[in-house]
Curated annotation (Swiss-Prot):
GO terms for biological process: protein transport by the Tat complex. This is Sec-independent protein translocase protein TatA. It comes from Polynucleobacter asymbioticus (strain DSM 18221 / CIP 109841 / QLW-P1DMWA-1). Residues 62-73 have a biased composition (Basic and acidic residues). It is found in: Cell inner membrane. Gene3D superfamilies: 1.20.5.3310.
Length: 73
């Protein structure tokens, strides 16, 4: 009862193919592959220290002084 044999997995695969169809399964596989590739590319760029986002050194030229007033008079 612990492990399924190859025949169990083949029957499950046939049932899934009948329910979803091969075109739908292919689209799901492509979407999943694209997501994994995007994740790997993101992790690769995060590990590369040469490609860090430069820090902005500009300061605000204008400051706004706001005086709070009591609305409830």
């Amino acid at each position: 009862m612990g492990s399924f044999s190859i025949w169990h997995w083949l029957i499950v695969l046939v049932i899934v193919m009948l329910v979803f169809g091969t075109k739908k399964l292919r689209n799901i596989g492509q979407d999943l592959g694209g997501a994994v590739k995007g994740f790997k590319d993101g992790m690769k760029s995060a590990e590369d220290p040469n490609e860090q986002i430069p820090q902005s050194t500009t300061t605000a030229e204008k400051t706004v002084d706001v005086q709070a007033k009591d609305i409830n008079k």
